[in-house]
């Protein structure tokens, strides 16, 4: 995960357009309503609101002020207080002083490569960034279910390439991961080495069996079972191609031929260089 974060910092710092023109969609879960915010900012992040009967839970709040303004305006229209903010992978800004994180994530986001990445973002994006979340942090052990705003949230260990991030099963229906399993090529921010292919594949198979019917990502928004099945097959094919020890040029050609016209093809050559070292 450290290599991925460093790569993200370098790539995103090169693009400082942060004006948000995001969009929202809603999905009815078992006992709650899920509101999805697509920021359309430089990070292409997605943020989430889980609306219970009397209160809200915010997950992965936006990082930029323009996005946060849109997000907060939408929240106010819902007319319910924010009970808790959940930070799984992305530290942002939110009004709640009660913060929940998966086990180990609080320390991880406050030191080493993650702290350096956020410092780099601050230097690049300056005042366009929100003040990062501060409050009383509660960490949730993996395998534990907690109840927030009257809704169950189960925290399971996420894929090893995203550790210490968690897979969070929301209301027995929606599984939040770092990357939604959408029908597109992976890039070097998701998969940075041959080893991480197997880790990501193992994580998706765990997500398939977690009880969810939709899968969410901090990047990519909402994916259905067809998207999940595609991504499992896609990573399985990458694993098979790598087993033959191809050079980067051969691997890139083979992957493009296996998935012609698939979104994200412009990043396949860079992916091949990373995986075929």
Model-derived regions: residue spans:
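Sec-dependent N-terminal signal peptides
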Residues: 4-13
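Boundary at the C-terminal end of the N-terminal hydrophobic targeting segment
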Residues: 10, 18-22
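C-terminal regulatory/interaction regions
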Residues: 21, 247-277
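Conserved beta-strand hairpin/beta-sheet module of binuclear metal-dependent hydrolase folds
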Residues: 23-77, 166-179
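Active-site neighborhood of phospho(di)ester-bond hydrolases with catalytic His/Asp-centered motifs
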Residues: 58-62, 81-105, 175-180, 210-221
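Active-site HxH/HxHxD metal-binding segment of metal-dependent hydrolases
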Residues: 73-145, 242-243
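Ligand/cofactor pocket segment of small-molecule handling proteins
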Residues: 138-200
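Divalent-metal (often Zn2+) His-rich catalytic cores of metallo-beta-lactamase-fold enzymes
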Residues: 197-254
């Amino acid at each position: 995960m450290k290599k991925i974060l460093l790569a993200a910092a370098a790539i995103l710092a090169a693009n400082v357009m942060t004006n948000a023109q995001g969009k929202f969609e809603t999905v009815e879960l078992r006992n709650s309503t899920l509101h999805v915010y697509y920021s359309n900012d430089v990070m292409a992040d997605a943020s989430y609101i889980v609306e219970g009967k009397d209160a809200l839970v915010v997950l992965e709040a936006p990082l930029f002020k323009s996005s946060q303004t849109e997000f907060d305006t939408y929240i106010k229209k819902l007319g319910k207080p924010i009970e808790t903010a959940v930070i799984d992978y992305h530290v942002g800004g939110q009004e709640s002083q009660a913060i929940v994180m998966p086990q180990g994530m609080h320390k991880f986001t406050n030191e080493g490569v993650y702290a350096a990445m956020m410092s780099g973002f601050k230097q690049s994006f300056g005042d366009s960034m929100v003040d990062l979340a501060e409050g009383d942090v509660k960490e949730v052990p993996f395998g534990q279910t907690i109840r927030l705003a009257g809704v169950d949230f189960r925290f399971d260990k996420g894929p090893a390439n995203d550790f210490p991030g968690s897979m969070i099963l929301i209301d027995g229906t929606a599984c939040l991961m770092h990357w939604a399993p959408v029908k597109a090529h992976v890039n070097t921010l998701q998969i940075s080495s041959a080893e991480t292919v197997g880790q990501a594949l193992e994580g998706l198979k765990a997500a398939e069996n977690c009880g969810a019917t939709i899968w969410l990502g901090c990047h990519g928004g909402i994916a259905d079972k067809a998207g999940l099945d595609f991504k499992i097959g896609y990573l399985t094919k990458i694993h098979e191609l790598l087993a033959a020890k191809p050079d980067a040029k051969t691997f890139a050609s083979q992957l493009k031929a296996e998935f012609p016209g698939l979104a994200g093809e412009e990043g396949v050559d860079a992916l091949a260089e990373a995986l075929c070292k």
